[in-house]
Every structure is written in structure tokens, then in C-alpha cells.
């Protein structure tokens, strides 16, 4: 399997795509369905508003990996920009479980799932971690500009109490794919899925953009008998849904790893395999293959 580039398609009309607006929330017809979002959000909201999609390189990879009937987890689902794609790809016989701890963002996630008729999605107002607990989600001003998805949870003493669950506690009969984008807490998610990984051997897609936490995450996945590949995805593509030529994210990429069970026959072409825990993606990906 090759790492796909973002795909081109017929350009949609931006002006007619706006269906509703109330306060900071807009509803727009986007690439993977009708999406509600907060316009002040620096990355996901602005991407949906200007381009009709978010992180197209990631979406293209997910579309290639997911199949009808699969069970897929979206840990750190945010507003559901990828969740609705997951739901489409696994189909009505599949299952999607989406975690989002911020209440307002979770409400948008639920709205987006239901506006697109995805009855196969379970949206959990919770975080996933290494053990059952709870955390405090601090107040967020969603009327002001900010990267709401960058809120690193943990350590707050004040705020709304939200449960932390383990993926193992779900006792899933099958699990084929787990995406984890949880602002540096990816290792905790993996630890809480230890038995699920042993039993189901899902593909994993985990963010790894914090150098101080990278080695521990890589070692954890190596210990679980996974092969790892760097996947760097630009936030902008000229082939976006609205055909918008204005790149507001020049040089901005998301840094992730695709983890494949060692026993899997899946071949990943066009991506750098992670060879050691101390790798720095900046150095490795600057070198010729």
C-alpha cells in the first residue's frame, strides 16, 4: 500500500455551501458531509470554513485503510472532521467509537454525526487513558480565536469533571483501527489499550509531535510488536473541496506515525519506517530515501 496524496475532485461552490450561522457556529456543506464548526477555531474550524475539509493527507490515508464492517476508534475526535469519514468508510455494519472530553466540542461532534445520519457512531463525552479516573476540563472561551484542539488535559484543579476510560474497558469483540490525537497523551491511550492491542491487533495512527515524549511512545509501540512509519500531512492542499488557492497554513504539517502489526502483510510504500526510539522526524525526513 502506498501513502496516498490528497485527492482531487470537482470543486464545490463556497458561497452556496453555507447552510446556517448562529453566533460562532457555522454549518457548511463539506467534502464528507454537512459539518457544524466554530469559526474561531484556528485549525479545524478555519479549515472547514475555507477549504471544506481538514488535514486532507490524513483523510486520504484513512479512506484507504478503512473498510466496510470495521470497528474504528477516533480518540481525540474534536468536532468530528475525521469521525464522519470513519463512519462512511466502515458503513452501517461497522462501528465507530469517538472520544471527546470538551463538552462544547463534543456537542458539535454529536451534531455532525447525526446531521449526516451516522447511526454507527458512539460519541463518548470522555477521555481515553491508561486507567479509569477523571480529569478537569478548564473553561474555554469558544467566542475567541484559539486552537481548541491543542488543549492539553491533565493537571487542572478546576473545571468540568470528565471521566477517563480505558479502551480495554470497552471489551470490544473486534477492533481494526485506532486513531489517537490527544496532545501528548498518546502513550497513556496505548497503555489503556494493552489487552485490545494483543487480542485484536488493530492498525494505529498516533500523533507524535512532542520530541520530549517521542522516544517513550515509540518504545511502547515497538514493545507491542508494531512496525512504525512516519506520516507527515500538510494542512493545506490546492486540491481542497472549495478550490481555495489561499494557503493560510504555509509549512504547517501534522506529525503522526502509522503503526502496523509486525505479523501483518500490509506493505507501506512511500513512507519512512521508524528504526529507533531516538529518531527525530525532522532529521530523518530531511534525508534522501
Please annotate each region the language model reported:
Residues 1-289:
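Phosphate/nucleotide-binding beta-alpha loop and adjacent structural elements of enzyme active sites
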Amino acid at each position: 500500500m502506498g501513502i496516498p496524496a490528497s485527492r482531487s475532485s470537482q470543486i464545490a461552490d463556497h458561497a452556496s455551501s453555507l447552510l446556517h450561522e448562529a453566533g460562532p457556529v457555522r454549518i457548511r456543506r463539506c467534502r464528507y458531509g454537512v459539518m457544524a464548526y466554530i469559526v474561531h477555531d484556528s485549525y479545524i474550524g478555519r479549515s472547514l470554513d475555507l477549504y471544506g475539509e481538514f488535514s486532507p493527507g490524513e483523510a486520504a490515508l484513512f479512506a484507504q485503510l478503512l473498510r466496510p464492517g470495521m470497528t474504528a476508534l477516533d480518540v481525540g475526535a474534536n468536532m468530528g472532521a475525521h469521525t464522519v469519514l470513519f463512519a462512511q468508510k466502515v458503513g452501517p455494519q461497522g462501528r465507530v467509537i469517538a472520544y471527546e472530553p470538551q463538552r462544547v466540542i463534543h456537542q458539535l461532534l454529536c451534531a455532525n454525526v447525526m446531521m449526516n445520519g451516522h447511526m454507527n457512531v458512539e460519541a463518548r463525552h470522555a477521555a481515553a487513558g491508561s486507567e479509569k479516573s477523571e480529569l478537569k476540563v478548564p473553561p474555554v472561551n469558544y467566542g475567541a480565536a484559539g486552537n481548541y484542539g491543542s488543549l492539553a488535559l491533565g493537571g487542572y484543579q478546576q473545571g468540568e469533571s470528565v471521566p477517563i476510560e480505558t479502551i480495554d474497558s470497552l471489551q470490544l469483540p473486534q477492533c481494526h483501527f485506532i486513531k489517537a490525537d490527544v496532545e501528548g497523551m498518546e502513550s497513556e491511550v496505548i497503555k489503556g489499550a494493552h489487552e485490545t492491542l494483543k487480542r485484536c491487533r488493530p492498525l494505529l495512527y498516533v500523533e507524535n509531535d512532542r520530541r520530549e515524549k517521542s522516544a517513550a511512545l515509540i518504545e511502547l509501540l515497538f514493545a507491542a510488536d508494531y512496525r512504525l512509519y512516519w506520516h507527515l500531512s500538510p494542512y493545506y492542499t490546492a486540491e481542497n473541496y472549495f478550490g481555495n488557492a489561499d494557503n493560510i497554513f504555509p509549512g504547517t504539517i501534522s506529525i503522526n506515525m502509522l503503526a502496523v502489526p509486525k505479523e501483518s502483510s500490509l506493505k507501506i510504500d512511500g513512507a519512512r519506517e521508524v528504526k529507533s526510539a531516538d529518531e527525530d522526524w525532522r532529521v530523518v525526513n530531511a534525508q534522501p530515501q
